[in-house]
Amino acid sequence: MNNTEFHELVDAKLQLLEDMIDDSGADIEPIITGNVLTLEFENRSQIVINKQEPMHEIWLASKSGGFHFAYTDEKWTCSKTGVEFIEMVKEECQKHADEVIQWA
């Protein structure tokens, strides 16, 4: 994968994530600054997601720790847990929000 393909794939995944957050009605504020997407919660906790172009990875930092996602078999998978990116974000959002989020 070249850098252009990497950015296209990540941008599409992050847009999907933002749409899912909007559709959920959860009190989560997505803030984009450069290559970083910060999800801020009502309790002021944050999940930070960023593009790591040199490694072609997505990195996620939350109160559960740091996670790296690589694109294999047409999905972003965590190198530590094997969990798919969107599933991990959903789990972490519920931990940060301290409530069940109704994902569409």
Curated annotation (Swiss-Prot):
GO terms for cellular component: cytosol. The keyword Transcription regulation does not apply. GO terms for molecular function: ferric iron binding; ferrous iron binding. One of its GO terms (biological process) is iron-sulfur cluster assembly. Keywords: Iron, Metal-binding. SMART domains: Frataxin_Cyay. Pfam families: Frataxin_Cyay. InterPro entries: CyaY (IPR047584), Frataxin/CyaY (IPR002908), Frataxin/CyaY_sf (IPR036524), Frataxin_CS (IPR020895). It comes from the Bacteria. NCBIfam families: FeS_CyaY. Involved in iron-sulfur (Fe-S) cluster assembly. May act as a regulator of Fe-S biogenesis. Belongs to the frataxin family. PANTHER family: FRATAXIN, FRATAXIN, MITOCHONDRIAL. This is Iron-sulfur cluster assembly protein CyaY.
